[in-house]
């Protein structure tokens, strides 16, 4: 596994600057939530840093690494390209960053779906929505307050907010 310093060095070259800052915010927010809920801080750090590592891959690259990583797609997941960076990210984290911890890989894999989440997965899912640069999301302050008190209620609120946003943009919403 690469050191965190090496991961950050690579990510800073592969992500847009704003996405890199977002990833740092997810890492830091996830660690704060880990302290509140008694989750493993190192797992939260690594999943937070790497959750968007495949964000700027082409569709072809994402599908290729998903296949190479042996990641199975959920029904309809391949019909909405923005969802694919999560399974591609899990595969990339494993194959290129040396992450072998299945819990970390699962948190990266599920961070766009909210499907049947354990504590680590819930923390990454919510941290992705509430990290400090996410000031443009309507209802984010309410979501932040909820996250510090009930992480699984915050997961449900994130799902609701995401569904409402997708519907308002005319995107098809899949029940995953």
List the predicted regions and their residue ranges.
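Active-site hotspot residues in diverse enzymes, especially metal/ion-binding acidic/histidine motifs
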Residues: 4
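Divalent metal-dependent catalytic cores for phosphoryl transfer on phosphate-bearing substrates
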Residues: 8-13, 31-153
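A short, charge-rich alpha-helical start-of-domain segment used by transcription regulators
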Residues: 17-19
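N-terminal glycine-rich anion-binding loops that anchor highly charged ligand groups
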Residues: 22
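Glycine-rich, aromatic-bearing surface loops/beta-hairpins
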Residues: 155-157
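Charged phosphate-binding loop/patch that engages nucleotide di/tri-phosphates or the phosphate backbone
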Residues: 161-176
